[in-house]
Amino acid sequence: MKKLKSYYMQVRNQQQSLDRKWILPLAIGSICSLFLLLLTNLASSSGQTRLIPFSVYGFRSSVFVESKINPVSVSLTVSVSPPPPPRLAYLISGSSGDGQMLKRTLMALYHPNNQYVVHLDRESSPEERLDLSGFVANHTLFQRFQNVRMIVKANFVTYRGPTMVANTLHAAAILLREGGDWDWFINLSASDYPLVTQDDLLHTFSYLPRDLNFIDHTSNIGWKESHRAKPIIIDPGLYMSKKADVFWVSQKRSMPTAFKLFTGSAWMMLSRPFVDYFIWGWDNLPRIVLMYYANFLSSPEGYFHTVICNAREFTNTTVNSDLHFISWDNPPKQHPHHLTLDDFQRMVDSNAPFARKFRRDEPVLDKIDSELLFRSHGMVTPGGWCIGTRENGSDPCAVIGDTSVIKPGLGAKRIEKLITYLLSTENFRPRQCR
């Protein structure tokens, strides 16, 4: 993490560098003042010797005041504590038949200091949604920390239509209103799964500026211009009470000139300032772009990308990655391959914190649980906040300690490698909104 922290000290903007120039003179002045205070105390008229120990990292000396006073060893040490861990806000969404997998993903991602919104769309049966609702309401940890919410009034979600964007905006608005303080918003599906513990993720992101947005994007839309941008689609999920697939109208439209189109992955990790921006839309760009994408095929793969790359204040905050391991055809099709045990080592070697797409009860998930997350069946992923024992199959998180304690493992080193690569001179600025 020292390399990562050192790198970010270099990429801070000029104003921040200028603001820090007064720190060294202030520190020197403070030390001199304390030194004079020490001398004053040592030579006090009462004749009593009063010692005031103080410290500055890396400095040791002996102070002599008159020959009758013994040398005083002054150990000056400034303890540098690690930065506070961020708080993450997750949306985990699913459709019919995803209830059990959604629960598993939630348990694998759980940490008391994070916030979670879960959603099963209206294609799911009432029984499946009630089962998830009961699970959230009755889980001991969720009850105690009150940080898991379910969208009870379910939305229709069509992946290829704007209803998925609407659902993401819905969850983000709930988290802004009810989720308290958090730093990044992460949207996942029930088919996603973590490859690292939350302690690994929180530790690594402690050292990053909180305004970074991890979003895979490009303006080179290629074939998508003729197949997605120019055709006009209608998503019945916006106005019908039953789910139906999108349909096309005969007329086509020209490419927009009021803003530039971008495309990329539908999965992202967005900063709170950017989430505030696209929910509130104070310069109206997010609303204008949203209305345009209401008739755009696969709008989740373009809406947020187009907004962030056309909003001047956020363009330079983008990191061109979705932080996922995904196995695609070449050229990519609508959906990626389902991951299996054969993909396990490639997942680990990717250094990505998340992977998709998994089938329910795929054996590779058990391998991820045991070898990467150290999670037992039916339990949350343990972290530094879990101080119970594992004896006789006990849940270590049944006994809760300090929730601010983070104990990163090998997963943190893998994420650090990925982040260092993404923020290198060759990959960071040159790949922003191009």
Curated annotation (Swiss-Prot):
InterPro entries: GLCAT14A/B/C, Glyco_trans_14
Spans within the Cytoplasmic topological domain: 1-21
Lineage: Eukaryota, Viridiplantae, Streptophyta, Embryophyta, Tracheophyta
Naturally occurring in which organism (per UniProt): Arabidopsis thaliana (Mouse-ear cress)
Name of this chain's protein: Beta-glucuronosyltransferase GlcAT14B
Keyword Glycoprotein set for record: yes
E.C. numbers: 2.4.1.-
Pfam families: Branch
Family: Belongs to the glycosyltransferase 14 family.
Lumenal side: 43-434
Location(s), subcellular: Golgi apparatus membrane
Top-level EC class: transferase
Keywords on record: Glycoprotein, Glycosyltransferase, Golgi apparatus, Membrane, Signal-anchor, Transferase, Transmembrane, Transmembrane helix
Domain of life: Eukaryota
Gene field: GLCAT14B
Glycosylated residues (UniProt): N138, N187, N316, N392
GO MF annotations in UniProt: glucuronosyltransferase activity
Example of a GO cellular component annotation carried by this entry: Golgi membrane
